[in-house]
């Protein structure tokens, strides 16, 4: 594993067929924060803008797995999107992070944060929060 530049950001994404949730780590890489939810093409533009503004040290991608921990139908779609990221951004380090239960965890966190029930079920808000859950899991695991 390579050393990460201390200035560049670590970004987390939750890839779906209609939306991509994006989260960004703070400069110290202690906390993940939702950045937004975007259409897949728009998310590539957002990632390019983040790269141009702050640099991106690594993109942490939510990796869809079955209950048993094996690849599932959505895994192929996520793999294809990672290739699109590499085409758009050039050389970028990509890490996979198990995304099982991240949407449920995101909804719980939104509830605990006092977000109203309709807001907790807004798919865009949940996708951005799920990206933050994915990224926070990576940050916690890698220290």
Swiss-Prot record:
The keyword Cytoplasm applies. It is found in: Cytoplasm. Its main location: cytoplasm. Keywords: Cytoplasm, Hydrolase, Nuclease, Ribosome biogenesis. SUPFAM superfamilies: Ribonuclease H-like. Pfam families: RuvX. Its EC number is 3.1.-.-. It comes from the Bacteria. GO terms for biological process: rRNA 5'-end processing. GO terms for cellular component: cytosol. SMART domains: YqgFc. GO terms for molecular function: nuclease activity. NCBIfam families: RNAse_H_YqgF (TIGR00250). Could be a nuclease involved in processing of the 5'-end of pre-16S rRNA. Belongs to the YqgF nuclease family. This is Putative pre-16S rRNA nuclease.
